[in-house]
């Protein structure tokens, strides 16, 4: 691909700009430009599309996206050391690369780009799951993005595509199953990165479901958080803080079942019962927010 876009090999770019990957930023750089092209192709045709990329680093995936014809790339980069390398790419593709320096968790993505938008990113390991959840949970749906093609830890990828009765099924699987069609595209071994991470990565592709089961985001979050927060307990116990057996009875769900056996439709039914009717509460402590790993 170096011959395709006329820019130097990524290893040379990294050495010239002194871009040693920082663990604190969750950085692992991809050096294989053929692999970055494969990731970009997984997103589908990119002509007339604006692509949002998070954590471009030295720009390997950025170059692949632009070479495959994306109308524009809007890249969010937190590390100022990477900006000169990205500026070289911008000069090679005039008017087609906008770089936003900042923390992706604080960016208003809906205001970043116009027209058809796809998200393609090698997500930093330390913020990848939270970014995905943020993109899944806007009240307004369908979302601003047409698809997401993300490279993440394989463990997270398995959680994204998991369904009921799968060992990897949890809160993330419910949210993704509720609002998207998700598939694992291919795995990426640690040796493809510098420095090599300790885990295998995977590329996952998600497309929004235009008309998901009607359900309030806030209620579904409460139900899944309570259920999977004590995933080995029966639902009558794990849901005690939000109504327990009374809530389960209204939803027509056996209180002796466990969280991992419920389908997405059943979780939505519980959420709608929680929102639509007053259910006795036990006075338990407020629910936490976020997606800690033990809740999956």
Curated annotation (Swiss-Prot):
Localization, UniProt: Cytoplasm
Keywords associated with the record: Cytoplasm, Methyltransferase, RNA-binding, rRNA processing, S-adenosyl-L-methionine, Transferase
GO cellular component, one term: cytosol
Assigned EC number: 2.1.1.182
Catalytic activity: adenosine(1518)/adenosine(1519) in 16S rRNA + 4 S-adenosyl-L-methionine = N(6)-dimethyladenosine(1518)/N(6)-dimethyladenosine(1519) in 16S rRNA + 4 S-adenosyl-L-homocysteine + 4 H(+)
Binding positions (S-adenosyl-L-methionine): 28, 30, 55, 77, 103, 122
InterPro entries xrefs: KsgA/Erm (IPR001737), rRNA_Ade_diMease-like_C (IPR023165), rRNA_Ade_Mease_Trfase_CS (IPR020596), rRNA_Ade_methylase_Trfase_N (IPR020598), rRNA_adenine_dimethylase (IPR011530), SAM-dependent_MTases_sf (IPR029063)
Any GO molecular function: RNA binding
Disulfide cross-links: none
Electron transport in keyword set: no
Gene3D superfamilies tied to this protein: Ribosomal RNA adenine dimethylase-like, domain 2, Vaccinia Virus protein VP39
Family note: Belongs to the class I-like SAM-binding methyltransferase superfamily. rRNA adenine N(6)-methyltransferase family. RsmA subfamily.
Record's function text: Specifically dimethylates two adjacent adenosines (A1518 and A1519) in the loop of a conserved hairpin near the 3'-end of 16S rRNA in the 30S particle. May play a critical role in biogenesis of 30S subunits.
Protein's name according to its UniProt entry: Ribosomal RNA small subunit methyltransferase A
Lineage: Bacteria, Pseudomonadati, Pseudomonadota, Alphaproteobacteria, Hyphomicrobiales
The encoding gene: rsmA
């Amino acid at each position: 691909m170096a011959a395709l876009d006329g820019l130097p090999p990524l290893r040379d770019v990294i050495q010239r700009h002194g871009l040693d990957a920082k663990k604190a930023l969750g950085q692992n750089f991809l050096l294989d430009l053929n692999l970055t092209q494969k990731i970009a192709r997984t997103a589908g045709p990119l002509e007339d599309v604006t692509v949002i990329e998070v954590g471009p680093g030295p720009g390997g995936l950025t170059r692949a996206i632009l070479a495959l014809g994306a109308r524009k790339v809007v890249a969010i980069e937190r590390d100022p050391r990477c900006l000169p390398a990205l500026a070289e790419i911008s000069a090679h593709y005039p008017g087609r690369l906008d770089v936003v320096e900042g923390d992706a968790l604080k960016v208003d993505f809906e205001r970043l780009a116009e027209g058809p938008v796809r998200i393609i990113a090698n997500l930093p390991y330390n913020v990848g799951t939270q970014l995905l959840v943020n993109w899944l949970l806007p009240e307004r749906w369908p979302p601003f993005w047409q698809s997401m093609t993300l490279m993440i830890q394989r463990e997270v990828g398995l959680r994204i595509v998991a369904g009921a009765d799968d060992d990897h099924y949890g809160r993330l699987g419910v949210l993704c199953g509720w609002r998207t069609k998700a598939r694992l595209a291919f795995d990426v071994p640690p040796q493809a990165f510098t420095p090599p991470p300790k885990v295998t990565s995977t590329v996952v592709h998600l497309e929004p479901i235009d008309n998901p089961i009607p359900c309030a985001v806030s209620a579904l979050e409460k139900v899944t958080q309570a259920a999977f927060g004590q995933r080995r307990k029966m639902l009558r116990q794990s849901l005690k803080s939000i109504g327990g057996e009374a809530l389960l009875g209204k939803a027509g769900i056996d209180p002796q079942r466990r969280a991992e056996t419920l389908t997405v439709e059943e979780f939505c039914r519980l959420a709608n019962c929680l929102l639509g009717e007053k259910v006795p509460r036990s006075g338990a402590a407020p629910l936490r927010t976020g997606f800690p790993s033990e809740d999956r």
